[in-house]
């Protein structure tokens, strides 16, 4: 194993240790938010937000690392980026275009968008893990990150559902979320087309994880710290 790979793994382990230690200090370890069922669970809104912000940041870091590794190994000189622009399955969601727009968006809308994004990634993340496992010569780093992201996405969704319930008690979150239909592209026998589909999916995951991270930090600042952050 070369020094560059060792350095990348060391950085990821350090980040994971920092996140784990922070969560342990707050009594919110990286397990389901309510391991004994919602009826036995009392977690403060501040703790829920602290956990969610750290997990979303971790997911975005993993997504960026996974995309960069795939790009270097499979996409150099292929022009995949031109096909990936504006082709995400979540593009139909009316998300703010930048941080300034997000700051002007009502917190209920931002929370609904986060929930929609998280739910829309459950299925593609499951299939991403499955298909990467079957990819010949796929780096272990890509698979390990995909597995972690799938697990953390579920935990973050659970936490966001609890946050929604505390911030908007009695409200029902029933907005439909985009359905992913890209599995056939990940399974095509055309190698370039298959790699292009993987590239597009990872590009979209990095984009959406960045949005979720940004929206969550804004909500945390607005709701928990009354914009004093």
Swiss-Prot record:
InterPro entries in the cross-refs: 4_helix_cytokine-like_core, Somatotropin/Prolactin, Somatotropin_CS
Organism superkingdom: Eukaryota
Modified residues (Phosphoserine): 56, 64, 120
Pfam families the UniProt entry points to: Hormone_1 (PF00103)
Keyword set includes Signal: yes
Signal sequence annotation: 1-30
SUPFAM superfamilies, per database record: 4-helical cytokines
GO MF terms, alphabetically ordered: hormone activity; prolactin receptor binding
S-S pairs: 34-41, 88-204, 221-229
Alphabetic keyword roster: Disulfide bond, Hormone, Lactation, Phosphoprotein, Secreted, Signal
GO terms for biological process, alphabetical: female pregnancy; lactation; negative regulation of apoptotic process; peptide hormone secretion; positive regulation of cell population proliferation; positive regulation of fatty acid biosynthetic process; positive regulation of gene expression; positive regulation of lactation
Gene3D superfamilies in the record: 1.20.1250.10
Family the entry assigns: Belongs to the somatotropin/prolactin family.
PANTHER family (UniProt xref): PROLACTIN, SOMATOTROPIN,PROLACTIN
Record protein name field: Prolactin
Native species: Cervus elaphus (Red deer)
Taxonomic placement: Eukaryota, Metazoa, Chordata, Craniata, Vertebrata
The encoding gene: PRL
């Amino acid at each position: 194993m070369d020094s560059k790979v060792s350095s990348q793994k060391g950085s990821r382990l350090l980040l994971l240790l920092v996140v784990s230690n922070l969560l342990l200090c707050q009594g919110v370890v990286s397990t389901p938010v309510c391991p004994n069922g919602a009826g036995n669970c009392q977690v403060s809104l501040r703790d829920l937000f602290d956990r969610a912000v750290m997990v979303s940041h971790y997911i975005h870091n993993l997504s960026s690392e996974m995309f960069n590794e795939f790009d270097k190994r499979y996409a150099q000189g292929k022009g995949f980026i031109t096909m990936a622009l504006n082709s995400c399955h979540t593009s139909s969601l009316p998300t703010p275009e930048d941080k300034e727009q997000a700051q002007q968006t009502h917190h209920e809308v931002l929370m609904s968008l986060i929930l929609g994004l998280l739910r829309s990634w459950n299925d593609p993340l499951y299939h991403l893990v499955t298909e990467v496992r079957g990819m010949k010569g796929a780096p272990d780093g890509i698979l390990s990150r995909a597995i972690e992201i799938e697990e953390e996405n579920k935990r973050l969704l659970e936490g966001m559902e609890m946050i929604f319930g505390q911030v908007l008690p009695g409200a029902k979150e029933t907005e439909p979320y985009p359905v992913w239909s890209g599995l056939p592209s990940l399974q095509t026998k055309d190698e370039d087309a298959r790699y292009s589909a993987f590239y597009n999916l990872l590009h979209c995951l990095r984009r959406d994880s960045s949005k979720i991270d940004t929206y969550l930090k804004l909500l945390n600042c607005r709701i928990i710290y009354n914009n004093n952050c």
